[in-house]
Amino acid sequence: PRPRPGPPTAAAQTLLCPPPLLGGGFGGKEDASVQHHAALLAYLLQKPVKVKLTRAESIAVHPKRHPMDMTFTLGCDNEGNILGVKARVIADTGAYASLGGPVLERACTHAAGPYHYENFEITGEAWYTNNPPAGAFRGFGVTQTCFAIETLLNRMAVKIGISPWEIRYKNAIRPGETLPNGQIVDESTGLVETLLAVREALEDARYAGIACAMKNAGVGVGLPDTGRVKLVVKESKLHILCAASCIGQGVGTVLVQIVAQETGLDRANIVLEAPNTFTSPDSGTTSGSRHTTVTGEAAHRACLLFNDFRKGRPLAELEGQEFYGEYLAKTDKLGADKPNPVSHVAYGYATHVCILGEDGRIQEMIAAHDVGRAINPKAAEGQIEGGVTMSCGYALTEQYPLEHCVPTARLGTVGLFRAAQVPPI
């Protein structure tokens, strides 16, 4: 029999891993599920190994959204101006932590919504339980606390006699104001504009609901968040090297767009190389809506170096030259001892209106988003439509029942929202 190899030595092991192009990210591919099993078996057996989960195993072990128990108290004056919010968020992270800590941080930094407050107190806890693991899937913890604060705003509007739109417009965060996490928002903040964009449709509808939301870009809260891109001239073409995994976000397309625009090169002369751990610089995880902002800026900086060196010369004269760009999205830790910490480098804002028909079914969804500068408008629209579709399933059809901590649902009964059910958006 072939002798079994011993454990890997302490010396660094160099591994070649060319990740394929995949879809279906949204936080569902952040956790190690079968990768480490396959790698260990392949090392011990010295043979190719494939590990494949059954559908039931996948439903049981892949992280879902965190179940959360949330207690919110909201106060306002007689005109509907919010005076303060107090919230306690308790998350069930399951039998393994996965990203329970970071998810709880996002849930808390977004818990009060995109509104201006004079006073706030927000605490969060994540607990190990015997339930299936929960992770960053679909919203990174933000959807849960968004539901809580938006529901409470509707109740408050009824109590003081103003419309759900008006209470949001009164309290919407505006440039120069401070979010509950202490961060001052800049002049690009566009929540008010999204509210104005949906007002007419909301008022014209007989049955309709409204909600606002905010979402961070980048990992934030003081964690390392660096984008890296290397440009290499090979065979009279400019090659883009970046280890960012393409799992449905369109990061490859965005990088090509940025490089084409910044260098003025025809796209036929730009090559996006597949991620490769031998040659591509590490650009961090594909998570937290970070790559367009963070890795895109790294590409922009590499282009500036390329342009400065090129000085109008043809690519053939630059053969073999390399240009490296790096960008650190620097943020402050939660609880940082400073007056106005920066929790995230950027935020997006949105207002949605759900219009119902006489039968109580969704007739139309209207989504107004402040996306900053849309590098790829079509892709941005697709992400918004995907988010709306997922939220419809989250609100209306999906369920994940457990019996003695074991899931009982099958793929056909978990209630995934079907394409035929998606309303006009």
Q: What is the predicted function of each stretch?
A:
Residues 1-18:
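A conserved hydrophobic secondary-structure block that centers on an alpha-helix together
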Residues 17, 128-136, 177-178:
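Gly-rich Lys/Arg/Thr-decorated short loops/hinges at beta-loop-alpha junctions or inter-strand turns
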Residues 29-115, 151, 158-160, 164-262, ...:
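Cofactor-centric catalytic regions
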Residues 116-134, 273-276, 424-425:
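A glycine-rich, basic-preceded beta-loop-alpha segment at the flavin cofactor/substrate interface
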Residues 117, 133-145, 288:
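A short glycine-threonine-serine/GTX helix/turn-capping micro-motif
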Residues 130-138, 150-152, 292:
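Flexible glycine/proline-enriched surface loops and loop-helix/loop-strand junctions
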